[in-house]
């Protein structure tokens, strides 16, 4: 008798359920990551333009250090950096940023938080518009914004980082190391395909800091706590603060107004039309 075939009952393959990541999950992960850096002895520099992404990042940093302090952890000074681009900046945006700087300082004083705000400005001889008028550079058009960005933002912030490093070196003595200094930046992968690709190429993530100057033997460590955040996560966080569900250095009402005034619409509608993510290197962020 030939071998009999055993019939195997059909089993339906059920795909595993993937739980969506909630806003609170993203907040908890970001706060845990920031606290982990502090507990490991890293000194934090926070780069902020007071645009939507960097404002949310700064609020997360404040949440992290407040929580640590409440649990009895010693939190070293966190250095907040802002680039005032001077003549080029929209006066409304510039005035808004100055008020945000005052708000951060007032909140830190009231809450006894170890925050120190530094403001970088391009020297008058390096002002982009002064150089253009004086014939030392030419106006950038289209995508030719690297010289503008370098003059007004990157170079002054680089000088500021060196000044902060010198202060840390003096205060920490022999325990100081360039590897201990980490700059938090508010880059997100979903800002654009190009931004996501650039972040991947540099190794930026919300998991651990990356040294952007490793190839040249330098030490410029950056950490991106918002790397995996979507634009709607950012908007939802801002809405929570504006509606009083979360408290930080600002109620973000003026931040919302700046975006609304810029486009005549609410931030969410700007995003849906694709206008909320358009940024020039020397423009509003």
For the regions a protein language model found, what residue spans apply to each?
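Nucleotide-activated chemistry modules centered on ATP-dependent adenylation/adenylyltransferase
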Residues: 1-46, 52-285
């Amino acid at each position: 008798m030939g071998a009999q075939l055993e019939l195997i009952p059909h089993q339906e393959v059920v795909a595993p359920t993937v739980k969506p990541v909630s806003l609170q999950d993203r907040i908890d992960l970001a706060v845990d990551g920031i606290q982990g850096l502090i507990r490991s002895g890293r000194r934090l520099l926070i780069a902020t333009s007071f645009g939507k992404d960097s404002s949310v990042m700064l609020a997360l940093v404040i949440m992290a250090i407040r929580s640590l302090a409440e649990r009895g952890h010693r939190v070293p000074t966190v250095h907040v950096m802002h680039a005032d681009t001077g003549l080029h900046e929209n006066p409304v945006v510039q005035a808004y940023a100055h008020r945000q700087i005052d708000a951060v300082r007032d909140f830190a004083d009231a809450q006894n938080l170890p925050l120190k705000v530094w403001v970088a400005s391009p020297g008058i001889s390096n002002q982009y518009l002064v150089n253009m008028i004086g014939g030392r550079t030419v106006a950038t058009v289209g995508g030719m914004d690297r010289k503008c960005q370098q003059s007004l933002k990157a170079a002054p912030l680089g000088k500021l980082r060196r000044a902060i490093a010198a202060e840390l070196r003096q205060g920490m003595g022999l325990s100081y190391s360039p590897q201990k200094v980490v700059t938090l930046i508010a880059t997100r992968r979903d800002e654009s395909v190009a931004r996501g690709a650039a972040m991947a190429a540099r190794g930026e993530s919300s998991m651990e800091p990356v040294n952007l100057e490793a190839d040249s033997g330098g030490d410029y460590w950056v950490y991106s706590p918002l790397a995996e955040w979507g634009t709607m996560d950012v908007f939802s966080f801002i809405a929570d603060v504006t509606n009083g569900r979360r408290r930080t250095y600002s109620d973000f009402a003026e931040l919302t107004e700046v975006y609304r005034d810029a486009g005549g619409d609410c931030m969410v509608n700007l995003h849906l039309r694709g206008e909320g993510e358009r940024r020039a290197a020397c423009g509003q962020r």
